[in-house]
Design a protein with these regions (language model features):
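Non-catalytic terminal/accessory segments
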Residues: 1-443
Length: 443
């Protein structure tokens, strides 16, 4: 009961922070750290994921909880007094499936995660008043499906147009810290919080036992990283596009951004080409580079007498965003509409993971396999089950059934499981059918 009241108190305090930021949009807030007390730290700990990999100190949640009150009180005192020292993050490289490449991820210590969460709980209510409606990534009450819906409705209302598919090269590694300091100055000038943010930015990364201190960027994987990236691109892209670009355009335009994935759509081709020309210069001013091949202009007008069957490939007539390929197709009433289907790379990755799982777990009890595969299918439907994507999720469900049958057949030397026998098994251990969960018509 006490913890519930504490959470309610924190929510009220965050609401007051939000109200202050909303009423004074140009004010730099100088006294914020006093909000972070022991109650705040306990709530930050509650919200922190505790099942992830450990940081450089090797401390697990179980170890930290042995003296939780004392540990949080000590962390709070070090934070307030300035004695807190940010340890380096442990860098690991995660394979990018199907590419042979890797993506670096920084793993903070548990204590770092807790303090970052506490600071985020202060910063988030403030910046939520500033961030624009075009930004959807890692924000309360927003997510990829809201971004997809906004994009769909925007493109449909514009009747399609010209799309800039934006790709920022190594965003987290090249973010300029001096510019970040300038952006932070506009809103947050509390000495304790700014000092701590600086320590995180300069803590370095530990890789193969050596600590490196890159001059640019911020470690990917920290609790504080999403709000930092949102702030940076809010200043570099969102505000610039809304206040400097759009007023100079001839036609309508829109921006949809999810973290560092962004897409710009224009009704007028000349507008799109002019913006595409200046984008590299704009990003270059802030230390960022656009990928020269992946950043491209797509003619995303609906097919017509002069464009239908013009010989362009599907890639030239479509674009991918948030795991979906967007293209024009006919509705049931015969009208051209923007349609979405699971991107080929995402479908291949999902099936590859199912194959790996079935191979490893083929000797588990059939009931246990059914439960796990059902969970995987429902998770797939929960994300990819959107209007117009029924064919792709049905194909995924069918492939999962085939993969399961294949690996069940290899449980013994008795021979391949016939479809007749397997169908009887499916009646006893059914898998959930494909289901559309998100409808664009419900928004």
């Amino acid at each position: 009961m006490t913890r519930a009241l504490d959470r309610e108190t924190i929510s009220t305090r965050q609401g007051k922070l939000a109200e202050l930021a909303r009423k004074a949009p140009d004010m730099a807030l100088r006294t914020l750290a006093h909000h972070i007390d022991l109650v705040w730290m306990h709530e930050a700990y509650r919200r922190t994921r505790k099942d992830g990999a450990v940081g450089v100190d090797g401390v697990t949640a179980e170890m930290y909880e042995e003296r939780l009150d004392e540990n949080l009180a000590d962390l709070l005192e070090r934070f307030k007094s300035g004695r807190y020292r940010a340890p380096p993050v442990r860098r690991v490289h995660i394979p990018k499936e199907g590419t042979g490449k890797t993506r670096p991820i920084g793993i903070p210590t548990l204590e770092d995660k807790v303090l970052q969460r506490a600071v985020l709980m202060v910063l988030e209510p403030i910046y939520e008043q500033d961030f624009l409606a075009c930004s959807f990534g890692f924000r309360p009450g927003r997510g990829p499906h809201q971004a997809l819906d906004a994009l769909w409705h925007g493109l449909m209302s514009m009747g399609g147009g010209w799309v800039i598919d934006l790709d920022i090269s190594s965003f987290f590694d090249t973010l300029d810290r001096k510019h970040l300091e300038t952006f932070l100055d506009k809103r947050v000038r509390d000495g304790v919080i700014r000092r701590t943010l600086g320590k995180w930015m300069n803590a370095g990364v530990m890789e193969d036992g050596a600590v490196l201190h890159p001059e640019h960027g911020t470690p990917q994987g920290g609790v504080i990283s999403p709000v930092i990236s949102n702030l940076y691109l809010h200043e570099v892209l969102d505000l610039w596009f809304e206040h400097e670009v759009k007023p100079r355009l001839r036609g309508r335009a829109m921006l949809v951004r999810f973290a560092d994935d962004a897409l710009l759509a224009f009704a007028n081709e000349a507008d799109a080409r002019r913006v595409l020309e200046v984008l590299p210069k704009r990003f270059g001013r802030f230390g960022l580079t656009l990928h020269p091949v992946k950043t491209r202009l797509v003619d995303f007008r609906p097919p017509g007498p002069t464009r239908d069957g013009d010989g362009r490939s599907q890639r030239e007539r479509s674009f991918d965003l948030l795991g979906f390929t967007h293209y024009w197709g006919r509705s049931r009433k015969g009208r051209w509409v923007v349609q979405r289907k699971t991107a080929r790379s995402r479908l291949s990755r999902a099936l590859r993971r199912v194959r790996q799982w079935c191979r490893v777990h083929r000797h588990d009890k059939v009931a246990d396999q059914q439960r796990a595969l059902s969970q995987k299918l429902r998770g797939h439907y929960a994300y990819y089950g959107i209007t117009g994507n029924g064919k792709a999720i049905s194909a995924f469900a069918y492939e999962v059934v085939c993969i399961w049958r294949k690996w069940l057949s290899r449980r013994s030397h008795a021979g391949r499981l016939t479809w007749e026998v397997f169908q009887r098994l499916l009646q006893r251990y059914p898998l959930p059918p494909a289901q559309v969960v998100h409808s664009v018509y419900a928004t």
